[in-house]
């Protein structure tokens, strides 16, 4: 197994745990981004941290996006005291946003040339969805962040 394969496996397992912990039915790009940010000592983690996007900051941005989306639907986030009850036996499978990111990554380079930064680049490349909305609400310059990732590729 290559170094990238080990990295991807670790990220996907961490993303699965994130999805399970928040009661999600599927592993989405947001879970993978949180997992990438939590991989201490990796280049993607350093790029995100340099942009002020550690795991806690990303989680806060994703929570703001969720509240904003509920508000757009006319629902106040605090109106209900509903919390997900994680099922330790539930094994979420990759959802649409994660599959799209993985497809973007796989389509951009040969497998043997992939690095952890390619995964981050693919996660940040989404034009629509939870991740770009969360980053926009957090005031992140997504174009500058993507450019910084591309510099490292």
Model segments located where?
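Histone-fold recognition with a strong bias for associated Lys/Arg-rich disordered tails
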Residues: 1-153
């Amino acid at each position: 197994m290559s170094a990238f394969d080990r990295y991807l496996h670790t990220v996907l397992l961490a993303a699965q745990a994130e999805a399970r912990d928040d009661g999600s039915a599927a592993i989405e790009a947001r879970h993978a981004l949180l997992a990438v940010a939590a991989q201490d000592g990796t280049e993607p983690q350093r790029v995100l941290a340099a942009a002020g996007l550690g795991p806690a900051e990303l989680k806060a941005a994703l929570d703001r996006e969720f509240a904003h989306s509920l508000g757009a639907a006319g629902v106040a986030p605090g109106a209900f005291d509903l919390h997900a009850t994680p099922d330790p036996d539930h094994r979420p499978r990759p959802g649409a946003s994660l599959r799209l990111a993985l497809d973007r990554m796989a389509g951009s380079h040969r497998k043997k040339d992939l690095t952890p930064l390619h995964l981050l680049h693919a996660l940040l490349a989404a034009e629509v969805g939870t991740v770009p909305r969360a980053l926009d609400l957090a005031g992140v310059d997504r174009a500058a962040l993507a450019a910084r990732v591309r510099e490292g590729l």
